Structure formats: C-alpha cells, structure tokens
C-alpha cells in the first residue's frame, strides 16, 4: 500500500464519512468497492465471532462512533483506541480492506491524541495480532 501523509486536525472526529474516505484510499484500485459497505454476509477464517449482517453495518458503525465519543470522557486514550479498533474489526463493514482501513483509523486516533503511529509488519501480524486480539477479547468480555 502506498504511504499516506496526512495532517490530522485536532478537532476532526472519526465519522462514517471519514471511515468511508479512508477505505476509498485503501481500495483506490477497486472503484466498485471503495468506501462502500458490504452487501453480503461474510465469515472470517479463524475468527471467534461472526461479523454483523450487512443490514446491521450502518447502525453498528453509528453506535460505535457514539460510544467512542462517550469513551473520550471516561477512558485513557490508548484503551479507547484499542476498543474502537477491536469493535470496528468485529463489525467488518467492507468486503475487503477492513484490516488496512482499521489500522489507518487506529493511527489516525493515535496521532490525534499525541502518540506516534504504529506499524505491524505483515510477517509479524500472524504471530502478534491473533494472540493479542484473543487476550483483548477475553479481557473485554470479563468486564
């Protein structure tokens, strides 16, 4: 994926438009799919949960955005950003590019909150992401 330099305004909130615009950049070579929520059910190999049905994507994204704003007052930024990322990936709103879009959204929030962007190399993802996501899910569900 091409690198992307963006000046992130402090007051820019993640919105459905921002999510779809970031996704459009991720899938710029697939005009029919870029920035468009999926219209078919999907399953993710090795996932513990199934993504929401297509008709629930928009309401779930709206709910996630509202929760994210409320959490800004209650949670440490890192915990809030991690939860947002986990829940976004669980919704799996697009037919392709969810992981890339989710990582860009995660970095958008990190930078906006004064943290450096992160990059998990593709070769490291298999070894770090699955165990980390499993422990995060266990932690979130035990609260």
Segments predicted by a language model, with ranges:
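FIC/Doc superfamily catalytic core
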Residues: 1-96, 100-143
